[in-house]
């Protein structure tokens, strides 16, 4: 049985709130905010059906300056967030009262009660979403193959043979080209996901007490159609009375069934990993909820674990840093993000159940004191404008 709020990701709170439109303020008709710069923080308010936007320089204890919310947005249980190379926002959305899920895309700078650019149904219970980070333009003389630009979504669908899976997309598309699933990946309630500069996948297994990394297959390019030369039209034959053949359903690609290239496990201090992020150096940050009912002073209490960037031959041991202790404010973290300056943001809740964002300075370690942002609702996922 999972600790704290992991099982339903705020399901009880969400059920009470997802049927109503956001009540965070009257923003109807506003669709473009200011020029939200790099490092602007976004946070999902899962039981308020909204995305909060925090201006750079928000003071300790401050709240959001803008939001995306309202009936036009189709948000009714936003979960996790990711930005693409155009700074468009992608959201996994799940409504526990209907068990319906959506993938939603919003235009860069969108605020208020806006129509999304894209909505697409998702099967199962989606959680984390991640997109390959933007890379510098390659040198003209470089012979290296370009890194594929991917998007990944952690998903759990109990109706299929292998319910735990990660959906693989070409970034900017809404139909997965493949999925990662089967006995070899050992996925066990995948939660948070991240992609590094080479599009390698990192995924937390909430019930598996580990974090795994995979080298994903490159999507096959879509072939360009060959032009057909024009010819003299032939007379149209008289239609046959035979019934038309039934269309053949397009088969779903067989899941990629591969072993991870490495795993970080309980031997390395993992207990209940939920969220994950990489910094610009590739260091791995894991939001771990710890053991059920373990207090902030317990060695098995909630923590942010930091492991070094992967390199071939590296044997992971204990984390190089561990943010943990009663001064941190950590309680039941669900996501972690690190901006380009190294500032660490954590989605969490207070002991009283209010959503909160904890903020730690670069290099934070041990029982570090956090500053905070207030949230109008339950916070599940975070996103930072690249």
Task: Identify the residue ranges that each predicted region occupies.
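Ser/Thr-rich, Proline-interspersed low-complexity disordered segments
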Residues: 141-145, 218-256
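Beta-rich, blade/repeat-based domains predominating
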Residues: 24-37, 71-86, 122-142, 146-148, ...
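Short loop/turn segments that connect beta-strands within beta-propeller blades
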Residues: 55-60, 107-112, 170-175, 215-219, ...
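Conserved beta-propeller blade signature
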Residues: 40-43, 88-91, 138, 150-152, ...
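Short loop/turn segments immediately following the C-termini of beta-strands
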Residues: 46, 94-96, 155-158, 206-207, ...
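Blade-level signature of beta-propeller repeat domains, shared across WD40, Kelch, NHL, RCC1
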Residues: 353-386
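An edge-strand/N-cap motif at the start of beta-rich repeat modules
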Residues: 28-70, 80-81, 89, 104
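Bacterial Sec-dependent N-terminal signal peptides
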Residues: 2, 14-43, 220-222, 228, ...
